[in-house]
Regions:
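Conserved AMP-binding/adenylation subdomain of ANL enzymes
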Residues: 198-216, 224-264, 278
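Conserved AMP-binding/adenylate-forming
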Residues: 41, 58-103, 219-222
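Conserved ATP/PPi-binding loop(s) of AMP-dependent carboxylate-activating enzymes
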Residues: 349-354, 363-395, 415, 430
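Conserved pre-ATP/AMP-binding loop-to-beta segment of ANL
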Residues: 10, 25-29, 160-179, 185-186, ...
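N-lobe entry segment of adenylate-forming
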Residues: 1-64, 473-477, 511-522
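Conserved AMP-binding A3 loop
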Residues: 44-48, 175-202
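AMP-binding/adenylate-forming catalytic core of the ANL superfamily
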Residues: 265, 379, 384-385, 405-485, ...
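Gly/Ser/Thr-rich phosphate-binding loop
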Residues: 263-266, 278-342
Length: 522
């Protein structure tokens, strides 16, 4: 068996573009933005050109002093070159560490301390933003995608460096590090290996095999997210044309999709939520879409119905539930004819070749809607460890099962219902996520609704409206009449909602801000 087979043995990120170029070199990739690291490359590439750019950048990174086995933090502005640089780092045999551009300075410093002097690969604006950090103490070297500066190595000045052949780790050695969302504090550093990353492709390969024709795939995911690397590996391997979306504003997305007409869109739930109103756009930007795919978090039923209705094809909406440490765990499709019956808490059934899932009682009684159990997962796709926090990782492992931190139950038909994060449960409220689904269904003017724990232990609805228009309190009271346990709503501008790099609402942070606001008023 070939050690670098990405399906049967392991997913080796640094060799994916080169291998794909051999089989599908002419397949196009189209971007809605320019690459920071290669501004002259243009917005339309072939897979063969992509592979050449990865080899070129790997040579430059090696010339900058990066060695196999070392950590290289990739922390720069959102751009497809984040994926490109990480893949080039992996080709050198070093370990790319994907730290989101949304992380603040203190958090970034804390994570780099945990990594013990990594290289930092960044850009000019980020270097200016990090001016207050002791980078000389925190890092082995600082490498910039742009111009040079004192103490900074410029990749631009290393153009023409000799290329490097892919250097492959062992199947169970660290190959990439990403981080958790950090909704409860400093993020954890999640270690992925070639074996765990390869395992996560299995269920998705089965789903892709069901597609009758090769579709153009539009991807709008944080470029440093673990899901992005899986999605790109699948698209490149299968020779599927790719549209890479960085500009996520609805009007920008509409224009890009109208021009290039994707057949499959992969995006995060809150991105689809932000695009909902495009369903009513007379230009019909979703008309060509056969498949919508949303991963990791549950998606609101209203969003699914509206997007399916916006397609001119017999569209399907695939919801896949999982997390950074687990990968895809369960999933299910929705269709236009069945979406009106969608229960937003039913996140899916076991996927072929994917994780096993169990429910663990919290009190000795059978898990149910009224008595949710702890959701555990088990398979070979679970991340290897938390870098620098093995004890914290081990605390989540119970008899070989990974404790996800979510609570839920199984229906009589076997569908896993995810009701809440354990840490976000509010006494006397039931499922906050279920309330959010049902109220969003009734109030189309809401673009986001988050129920968080208030200072008096009541559930406080935080609402955001389209265009930040004032909330109609009469319509609100009618919509929440079945939930007398809720406090009065607090409306904030959507831009003030604290989010992670993957657009998750940071509920703990939102609750903290709410408490501070009420204390100031009180």
């Amino acid at each position: 068996m070939r050690r670098n087979s990405i399906h049967k043995q392991g997913l080796y990120l640094g060799s994916v573009p080169e291998r794909a170029a051999v089989a599908n070199g002419a397949t196009p990739l189209t971007l809605d933005h320019d690459l920071d690291v290669l501004p002259g490359a243009g917005r339309r590439l072939t897979v063969a050109e992509l592979a050449g750019h990865v080899e070129d950048l790997a040579g430059r990174i090696s010339a900058a002093g990066v060695k196999a086995g070392e950590h290289v933090v990739v922390h720069k502005a959102a751009n497809f070159d984040v994926w490109l640089l990480a893949t080039a780092v992996a080709r050198t045999g070093a370990v790319p560490v994907m730290l989101s551009h949304t992380l603040d300075g203190p958090t970034l410093a804390a994570l780099m301390e945990r990594l013990d002097k990594p290289h930092l690969l960044t850009d000019g604006p980020k270097l200016e933003a990090l001016a207050g950090l002791p980078l000389a103490e925190l890092t082995r070297s600082v490498i910039s995608v742009g111009g040079s500066a004192p103490g900074v190595v410029s990749l631009a000045e290393l153009a023409g460096s000799p290329g490097v052949r892919p250097r492959l780790q062992g199947l169970d050695e660290p190959a990439m590090i990403t981080h958790t969302s950090g909704t409860t504090g400093i993020p954890k550093l999640v270690v992925h290996t070639p074996r765990t990353m390869r395992a996560r492709l299995r269920p998705q390969l089965v789903l892709l095999a069901l597609m009758r024709k090769r579709e153009t795939v539009a991807i709008h995911i944080a470029f440093g997210h673990s899901r992005m690397f899986a999605a790109m590996a699948l698209c490149l391997t299968k020779g599927m044309p790719v549209l890479l979306v960085n500009r996520g504003a609805p009007e920008d997305v509409a224009e890009f999709f109208l021009k290039h007409r994707p057949g499959l869109i992969e995006a995060l739930p809150n991105s689809f939520l932000a695009w909902e109103n495009l369903a009513d756009d007379p230009r019909k930007p979703f008309a060509s879409v056969k498949y919508f795919s949303s991963t990791f978090d549950a998606i609101h039923p209203r969003t699914v119905r509206r997007l399916l209705g916006a397609s001119a094809r017999r569209a399907q909406f695939f919801q896949i539930y999982g997390q950074s440490e687990v990968g895809p765990a369960v999933g299910r499709p929705y269709y236009r004819w069945s979406a009106h019956r969608m229960d937003g808490r039913c996140v899916g059934y076991p996927l072929p070749g994917s994780a096993r899932v169990r429910l663990v009682s919290q009190n000795g009684k059978r898990p149910s809607a009224q008595n949710p159990g702890l959701i555990d997962a088990r398979w070979d796709g679970i991340a290897k460890t938390y870098h620098g926090e093995q004890e914290r990782y081990d605390a989540n492992v119970h008899d070989g099962w990974w404790r996800t931190g979510d609570v839920g139950y199984r229906s009589k038909f076997g569908c896993l219902h995810m009701l809440d994060r354990e840490i976000d449960m509010i006494p006397g409220v039931g499922s906050s996520l279920e309330i959010e689904d049902l109220v969003l269904d009734k109030l189309e003017e809401l673009v986001e609704l988050v129920v968080v724990l208030g200072p008096d232990s009541r559930g406080v609805p935080i609402v955001c409206t389209h265009g930040d228009e004032p909330l109609d309190l009469g319509r609100w009271r009618t919509a929440v009449a079945a939930y007398p346990q809720l406090a009065d709503p607090i409306q904030i501008p959507l831009a003030e909602l604290p989010r992670t790099a993957t657009m998750k609402t940071r509920r703990v942070e939102l609750s903290r801000r709410l408490e501070e606001k009420l204390l100031r008023q009180g």
